[in-house]
Amino acid sequence: MKVVAFERSVQGTGASRRLRNSGKTPGIIYGGAAEPKMIELDHNALWHALKKEAFHSSILELEVAGKSEQALLRAFQMHPFKPLVLHVDFQRVSANDKIHVKVPLHFMNQETAPGVKLGHGIVNHILNDLEVSCLPADLPEFIEVDLAAVELNQTVHLSDIKLPKGVTVITHGDDNPAVASISQPAGAVSEAAEGGEAAGETPAA
């Protein structure tokens, strides 16, 4: 995905405010051997790009003053109540250095999973993304979680997911965390419990 930016020479709160009033968003690109560079981007283009999943989890081609660099979106700051992007940070990436990125999960075959189709259960997304380590060329836009064989009251763990080549998951404390599950709706569980209690009641003499 290509992102066009321009060099920004003036800094400070007042300069940033004037920049935003002109329809631009201040930002910075840092990392690698080069010095950090102050940049500005068209706000509307950035606003629409931020709505795309790939913008957050893929290598971007950031063009500044006609020169392209590979970069990752690292952070962005929003206005508390206005639809306004206040600032954006990009990090340069090197083809030979591994990166740490959160990659979104795409849950496949949810409606046709046995636990949903036959067991009338609901799918619970315990995790929505995974933090991975890989070379930039191996970074996937998303990771698939296939629920095609998941039964009612079963849980899918990290070890059940087939990771793309060259990608490892960074876990924090739990080496095999739960990713998704299929369970009975809360109402169905309550009704079943009430039915069991009613069946166990003994009529008064």
UniProtKB/Swiss-Prot annotation:
UniProt record, GO biological process: translation
Cellular component, GO, one term: cytosolic large ribosomal subunit
This protein's record includes keyword Secreted: no
SUPFAM superfamilies: Ribosomal protein L25-like (SSF50715)
Entries under InterPro entries matching the protein: Rbsml_bL25/Gln-tRNA_synth_N, Ribosomal_bL25/Gln-tRNA_synth, Ribosomal_bL25_b-dom, Ribosomal_bL25_C, Ribosomal_bL25_long, Ribosomal_bL25_short, Ribosomal_L25_dom, Ribosomal_uL5_bac-type
Complex formation: Part of the 50S ribosomal subunit; part of the 5S rRNA/L5/L18/L25 subcomplex. Contacts the 5S rRNA. Binds to the 5S rRNA independently of L5 and L18.
NCBIfam families: bL25_bact_ctc (TIGR00731), PRK05618.1-2 (NF004128), PRK05618.1-5 (NF004130), PRK05943.1 (NF004612)
Protein name stated in the entry: Large ribosomal subunit protein bL25
Organism: Cupriavidus necator (strain ATCC 17699 / DSM 428 / KCTC 22496 / NCIMB 10442 / H16 / Stanier 337)
Lineage of source species: Bacteria, Pseudomonadati, Pseudomonadota, Betaproteobacteria, Burkholderiales
Gene field: rplY
